[in-house]
Amino acid sequence: MEVVMQFVVMHWNLWCCILLGYLQISCISLSSGHHLNRSTGLENWLGYSGSLVGDDSLLYDSAFVETSTSSFPLNESVSCEDLEGVGSFNTTCLLSSTHYLKSDIYIYGVGNLEILSDVSLLCPMEGCMITVNVSGNVKLGQDASIVSGSVVLSAANLTMGYNSYIDSSSLGGSPPSQTSGTPVGNDGAGGGHGGRGASCLKNNKTNWGGDVYAWSTLSEPWSYGSKGGGKSTKKQYGGNGGGRVKLLVKDTLYVNGSITAKGGDGGSDGGGGSGGSILVHAVKLKGYGIISAAGGTGWGGGGGGRISLDCYSIQEDLNITVHGGLSIGCPGNSGAAGTYFNAHLLSLKVSNDNVTTETETPLLDFSTSPLWSNVYVENNAKVLVPLVWSRVQVRGQISVYSGGSLIFGLSDYPISEFELVAEELLLSDSIIKVFGAFRVSVKMLLMWDSSIQIDGGESTVVTASVLEVRNLAVLRDFLPSQQNSVISSNTNLALYGQGLLQLTGDGDAIKGQRLSLSLFYNVTVGPGSLLQAPLDDDASRGSVTKHLCDTQRCPIDLITPPDDCHVNYTLSFSLQICRVEDLLVNGIMKGSIIHIHRARTVIVDTDGMITASELGCTEGIGKGNFLNGAGGGAGHGGKGGSGYFNGRESIGGSEYGNAILPCELGSGTEGPNESYGHVVGGGMIVMGSIQWPLLRLDLYGSLRADGESFSKSIKSSDGSSVGGLGGGSGGTVLLFLQELRLLENPYLSVVGGNGGPVGGGGGGGGRIHFHWSKIGMEEEYVPVASITGTMNNSGGAGDNDGRHGQEGTITGKACPKGLYGIFCEVCFICFFLFSSSYSWICSECWRYAVIS
């Protein structure tokens, strides 16, 4: 027994000696005064692997600073003395030595905490938490730092000196359960959180890495970022996700350093980690520093994290970033931007800091109680609203700036309707894309070098898109060298308003399958601008004109239209201006069936044009024949010219329609096969109606509904020329109005198109009709028209032996007694001598007077 006791005592003494020696060596190595950076020796000492911090937040050497490694009991607060500080947390505690922690730490007191310059409080392990809860002030000196997977700090004031930092970059713990922030597979894609991680896979499908999560808590974010994906089975993960930082400051937070929760870098062997979470509550946020939850760089960049600042005032000099990480494998496709939420103003900003990306940041359901104030998408951020039947509503602005894009719906399922409600919708150098129908309700729409693109797919189920702009809508080309501002839809599109609609820049346009502009007091189409419906392709035009080309019928909704203004598939027009006080056209209005209804005045300036030329029927009632190698022209107001080729004749299309009240489209011609192509007749322009005539039309520019000419030379298999197609017939211009002024050499035409080589016949002319609504005869005669320009209803020319198309018609409403002609001019002799008994034309009256 005695031998056994001696053996135990000997081993106990030996063990104690070994332990004391080990501790002595450790203390010497940690306090030797040699230069010691944040990561030197710590990986082995704490059993930690992976980068401690991101590249942008390297910890500086803590030379000449005492360091120690500490472990404290869980759920118990530590004292100032435990951290080898001077003072107390209930008065003022000064920390003068760096501490490496192996576990969570909790600091509590009613006093102040000051971490002196070059001193750090470090727990560089995934998910480790440092909590500071003091009633007084906290100050970080120059180059001082707090580093941990989670940092929670509560104080009356927090001052961060120059180059100091609170950092949880690349130290995130596990993200919430049932989330897909870490990508699946070995593609080296980035992790997701506030924004999706980037994927560098190249195929025809839309790809991304890790997905977003924690959307519902973006105003109070408290989730870790996610790891990036690896590129092999040996390395399954890339960079770590960012950690969490929560700062609860009763008064002022001064940041002259940085607060970061960035994703870790994955290098070329893995994707970048996604950014973590930063939450700040303070009355005043000041300084010149950085607050960042950016994604990490990797083969595919990590998505940005989430930042929420609940502060009464925020100094603009602060740099707040949640951009995605750079992608080494696909430099043009970084990670998607995260979210920055201003909880005091209730505004959301998604900015990618001009880092280019093809990866989207999904925004899910929006708050309805309370409503957010503003949403900003900017600096190359791409935002996706993926949920069907989504409503995005804010109290203030929705702004998309500087290369930003806002996408509603999914391209494979353009079946839903999306709503956007705000005071203002502001776009500058940006894009809004909609897959489905789009309903907008704003007071002001301003677009600079931007576009709204609406894709309703090929389904007729999608309803019309409606943009209600109550006060002001302006499309402007701000920089001539950049793109133009365009609103386009391949389905029905309506713009309603109570104020002003302006297209001011060269190339600015509003285009749709059908387009209705209504209720504005003024619509201005500036020089080089365009209003167009239908679109340029034949299918779009055919869907609008088909019901008027197959049978000869007059669209009653153009002659006696409904009082209200709406757009649907049952109405005949393709482009409607409805209940607009004044229309000024310096650019181009272009459509198959243009209807200007319940307007007061229309002014077409010198460079302006309203045209339905070459937008009528491909075939039609007066279709030109192609027979025996020769093509006859199409007919309408006049018969189409016959085509001749090698002595063989092809009769032109027949005349049709009513000269007194014309309401038909011009007809076209088609060849024997697709190689010939086709020729299209003129469309139709209707201004006013029987019940609501136009007050005045001032035409300084041009008003056209001409047929298309055929200029293509057709060759046979041996290279010899064959007969060409005839020209299309002119369309219709029908004007219900009180006064017409054709000034400064304007041009009003419904001419037929020319026949093509060889021997094509010309198209017949169209029809022009003036339906005068009120002719002043009470006290003195007031002319209804001032004509100094040109009206042309001629048929198109035939090629070679091809015949010209016949002339169309120009008619006016029957005049009162004493007036004659198309423009109801005064017949003076008739008026004074025979107005009570006769209403003949002047020549007849003059002849009767001479005989008498």
Show where each model-derived region lies.
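Extracellular, surface-exposed repeat/solenoid domains
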Residues: 302-324, 737, 766-786, 790-792
